[in-house]
Amino acid sequence: MDVLPHGGVRFAITHVLLPLLGFALALLAMRWSGGDQWLADRLYALQGGEWALRDAFVTQTLIHRFGRYAGIALWIGVVVAWLVARRRVEWAPLRAPLAYLAVAVALSVLCVAWVKSWSNMDCPWDLTRYGGLRPFVGLWDVRPLGLQRGACFPAGHAGGGYAWLSLYFFLGAVRPRWRWAGLTTGIGLGLLFGIAQQLRGAHFASHDLASAAICWTVAVATWQVFRPAMVRSRRLAAGTRAQGTQA
């Protein structure tokens, strides 16, 4: 018995090549068309020429701060569940899938943070165009000497949401029919966190796209590593159910 999605050439095309090509084209289109500034201009204008939602309860406290704590708590819950599964025989089929989920989420967040540590880009609220003090400097542009470094690309908070794209593969091993719900959950969390941060002036849309691309890449790569163990877990689950039926 296999886990879903199945591997092979079709998987490489549908889960690796096409998604990453889509992310790359979207990021290039945003850069060439000025889509980041176009969207940020309108969000800024709708708030009266300021980032009025920067410190609002919903965007700052509820979604940004509480959302971060909720994500950490959920990840800790996955780790605790994995520890319990290691001690309880009836939970044995969940060991590999839970380990995958914990590792994939953590690696996604860490990879986003790592790229953010050297990318050196500013937040919209830092730019003179939106009431800040710094000029816009693109990702591949030479940053002027003396200009304070930026730390806003890719989007860390949105990455905390998109990290849960790995639910697609976790549920593919545990409840294959639910895997699309897992994918939808990861996309929904990433969009929720990302849009809230854009409304605050903390990120451009391309920052969120980059985070989604990183998290999906990590989820796929980690799945390839854990897939053999997840297949064994699926077979163990099927054997356990068969023994229970015979009993």
Predicted regions, residues:
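Aromatic-anchored segments of alpha-helical transmembrane domains
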Residues: L25-L28, A106-C111, I187-Q198
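Structural signal for the C-terminal ends of transmembrane alpha-helices
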Residues: D2-P5, V79-E90, F169-R175, A221-R227
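Membrane-interface loops
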Residues: W91-V174
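Alpha-helical membrane-inserting segments
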Residues: L25, A29, D36, W75-L83, ...
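Transmembrane helix-loop junctions in multipass membrane proteins, especially transporters and channels
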Residues: G35, R86-E90, S117-W125, A202, ...
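Membrane-embedded catalytic cores of phosphoryl/pyrophosphoryl-handling enzymes
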Residues: F11-P19, V137-A247
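Alpha-helical transmembrane spans of integral membrane proteins, capturing the lipid-embedded, hydrophobic core
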Residues: P19-A24, A73, L101-V109, A212, ...
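N-terminal transmembrane-helix/juxtamembrane module of multi-pass inner/ER membrane proteins
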Residues: D2-V78, K116-S119, P124, L133-R134
